[in-house]
Amino acid sequence: MTPSDAPGSRWSDLDRPPLNAPALRRALLRPGGLWTSLDVVANTGSTNTDLAAADGPEGAVLVAEEQSAARGRLDRTWSAPARSGLFLSVRLTPGPGVPVHRWGWLPLLAGVATASALSRAAGVDTALKWPNDLLVTVDGRERKAGGILAERAGDSVVVGIGVNVSLRADELPVPTAGSLALAGAGRLDRDPLLRALLRSLEDWYTAWRGAGGDPAACRLQEAYAAGCATLGRTVRAELPGDRQLVGEAVAVDGDGRLVLATEHGMQRPVDAGDIVHLRPASSGE
């Protein structure tokens, strides 16, 4: 990792200024709060890998201005131009008060927290695609502007969050990607966006942990369903072992699984796999 204030750091693009780490610490680190440390580095391979390898307390936050080997679900790698987004990982330790089988809600919780924060702070509608994608609308089409990756690290979970903030069309890694800028966001200053994201994450995590991880009791399950663009859609679930399942996404159950109603009248829960939103033939797309 290279510290953000190290000699040779690349701050040549004035349209993409560096994060103000001291100001972020002053705003977010407080006695009795969740966040215990916040480090900003100029570049690293993966903030999730670095934070998982470090033996630190709950509430550690690691932010990178650039990642060279960021990972998504199924170990897919991705990258983005320096200072073009929010790339961070946080360490969460639910403790004995939350049964381990409920820890699977953490990436969904992070999605709710991130989507709600971006909708408020950036002024752009941000939706969720089950289980861990952040969607925005660009030129009338759904585009992925970010994602969540949660990994177990001892008695903790490291949750990685990536959001494309200022990427231009010619910088997108794939045609289905998007960014807050391309979605017409009213604010692209990453400092207030990061503050809003971490405050939202703290609020949701504190409520979830206080409810013993019960997603219904803390209204997380309700909030996820309300913000999930997958529900009510006909989707194709691409499952392990080259299997596929097509059906209408009708619910997210108490275990965080996506429930599909198939054409045979059965309801099938899906706990892992890629979800493809299928458009009706009449849409012309």
Predicted regions and their residues:
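Short loop/edge segments at beta-strand edges and connector loops
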Residues: 42, 128-130
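Long, positively charged amphipathic alpha-helical accessory segments at protein N-termini or as interdomain linkers
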Residues: 2-16, 95-126, 136-285
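N-terminal lobe of the biotin/lipoate ligase/transferase fold
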Residues: 1-120, 142, 285
